[in-house]
Amino acid sequence: MITILPAELYRIVYFVVLTALTLTYYRQLANATQRGVMMAPKPYTLMVTFAVAFIIVVGLRPISSAFGDTVNYASTYFMMQDGLQDAPTPGDGEYVFNLLMWNCAKVMPVQWFFFIIEIGYVLPLVLACWRMDRRNAPILLLFTMSAFSFFSFGTNGLRNGLACSLVFLALTYIRGNVLDKWVCGGLCFLAFNIHRSSLLPIAAMVLTWFYRKPRTMYYFWVASIFVSLVAGGAVSNFFASLGFDDRMSSYIVMDDEDAQQFSRTGFRWDFLLYSFMPLWIAWYAIFKRRMCDMTYLMLFGMYVYSNAFWIMVICSSFSNRFAYLSWFLYPVVLAYPMLRFPLWKQHHGRKTALVLLAHFAFTFLMWLIGK
């Protein structure tokens, strides 16, 4: 078994490198003019190198409980290697992921399987950021890889992270020609068959494509808070009864004893405040400064609709996994308007740099307090 780093050092090294990258780009942005932030191309080499290093080091991580569900995935993988599990069939849930695991188990050790998953998790993000804004792709990728959910869903919620990365890449194709739309549909199909809960952001993408009214999106998001406070339990049970994702349903209806093993339950005002920040930036960009484009509307709509669903079931166990169905878009929704539009009237580069620094600082703080 390959051991690049002891398990307990992974997060430390990750944050050391992220700190260096954040300070590097902070200085670059802070010294840039408004036009320089939006128009000057930034070399992608540094961030691509970090992404490749992340794939290698994290993909070949040791099997340790420090990485959450990595241990459970490895256990299933070993059972497949020992012939203790039947081959997956198309009728099984999440067939693509199970088939990939089954075929990998025949020919390679578990670490190489995780390496492949890590490629599928990170590479779509690299491509999506480049397709979305080639001049500022490294900044978008840094925002994405410094989000506080990024590391966890590369080592813990593997299916969720992999599926959402494919949905994010699919978003960059939806506005293209007929072939691009087929690519978008194919990526969404793969995502759904990797993790069925990705149906939520996929549905949000389709809804936003046909209905792009920002004011209505805000009303819907605010209404979801009242629905959660007044009838959160009933709404959770309703979604669980739909049964489109057995794992999602089990998270919703998990009893208190089981919930103690997972995330804290109850209405998460801290999560809600965190989720609100892109909405505040969007309000300032769309309504105050009248700055928007089709890509930003699609990003914002997907984020708002997906996040509103999570708010309605926010009291459920394992609420963080529901949240990720919108949070994977969080860093890009936050960064995109500052990189594409002259959002700030004064000191645009400095304010954009401060948002980047605050974004990373929040992730670092969450790690320090053990979230």
Predicted regions and their residues:
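Transmembrane-helix signature of polytopic, membrane-embedded enzymes
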Residues: 129-147
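Short acidic/glycine- and proline-prone juxtamembrane loop motifs at membrane-interface regions
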Residues: 154-161
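Transmembrane-helix motifs of polytopic, lipid-linked glycan transferases
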Residues: 116-133
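Signature aromatic-anchored transmembrane alpha helix within multi-pass, membrane-resident enzymes
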Residues: 222, 342-365
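Membrane-interface transmembrane helices that cradle and orient dolichyl/undecaprenyl
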Residues: 167-182
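Transmembrane-embedded, aromatic-rich helix segments that form part
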Residues: 185, 197-208
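Alpha-helical transmembrane segments and terminal signal-anchor/GPI-anchor hydrophobic tails
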Residues: 66, 71-75, 204-320, 368
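Short hydrophobic/aromatic helix or loop-helix immediately within or flanking a transmembrane segment
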Residues: 71-82, 86-109
